[in-house]
Amino acid sequence: MFQGQIDQDAATPVEANAIPDVLFERGLYWASGRSGVVNLVAAHKWFNLAALKGRADAIALRREVAEMMSEVEIAMAQREARTWLTTH
């Protein structure tokens, strides 16, 4: 039985032409703590990317996550989303 940890960002790279559903699912993954850790910065980033790709319901979830974040954390998430867009 596997007893290690899987780095989700390395294990499931998302291509630039990925469907919005995949990006949305990544937001849900980090917002819900499915990995055992809630990461609001990552959740905001993926919801933001899903919204940019046309997933309308990602906007509401991004807003909900942002309400639990500091301005610094939101800026970090936005920076990470911009970086992802430029590298993919």
Specify the residue positions occupied by each region the protein language model found:
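Terminal, low-structured helical/coil segments at or just beyond the last alpha-helical repeat
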Residues: 2-9, 13-16, 20, 63-88
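Generic signature of intrinsically disordered, low-complexity segments enriched in small/polar residues
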Residues: 5, 27, 32-33, 47-50, ...
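Residue-level detector of alpha-helix boundaries and kinks
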Residues: 11-12, 28, 50, 62
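Short helix-capping/linker turns of helical repeat alpha-solenoids
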Residues: 16-23, 32-34, 39, 47, ...
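Hydrophobic face of amphipathic alpha-helices that form TPR/SEL1-like repeat modules
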Residues: 23-32, 63-66
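Alpha-solenoid helical repeat scaffolds
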Residues: 41, 45-48, 63, 82
